[in-house]
Amino acid sequence: DVYKRQLLPDARRVCCEQELLQFASERRKIEWLSVRVLLYFMLKEDKQIGYSSEGKPFLTDDSFFISISHTKGYVAVILNPKTPVGIDIEQYGKRVHKVFDRFIRPDEQVEAYQGDTTWGGLLHWSAKETVFKCMKNADADLRKLCLSHFIPQKEGTFQVREYATEGQSLFSVGYRICEDFVLTWTSC
């Protein structure tokens, strides 16, 4: 309770306390509140987040495009005043290998980072989630997104081509590998 008072303005804190009642899970409450605190920290003013019928977040005053992601212990928010954006954060975990067939295309190659292909797999997964969030009415088949070949470094950029639309847009995706997660972001 002390932290909420220090991190959000009083009017917003009261509103948040009421909105938090909709969540049963303590983890989900923390994620939801963390996003609002991070947004307030970024903008130094209170903003309301709404959600489209597809579940995509938006600021109710339309001042910025927004994308949100969370993973165990972390949240990520990206804003852009002019163009839609996407962001994704994925915690390190070997389980990603079990689902490679759901998102890695035969013409894609997953490279290792510091001898571990888990990082490369997570970057593929995260980048495709990021681009998917940025696209309008996107097909949820992540195999319709193709990463250009790249050798993972601690941070950098790579290209992602989407094959879900006639336009087959090309996205530049930024990334960073941290101690226990990867973070990817793009703008449309």
Provide a role label for each language-model segment.
Residues 1-188:
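Core catalytic alpha/beta fold that binds nucleotide/phospho-ligands
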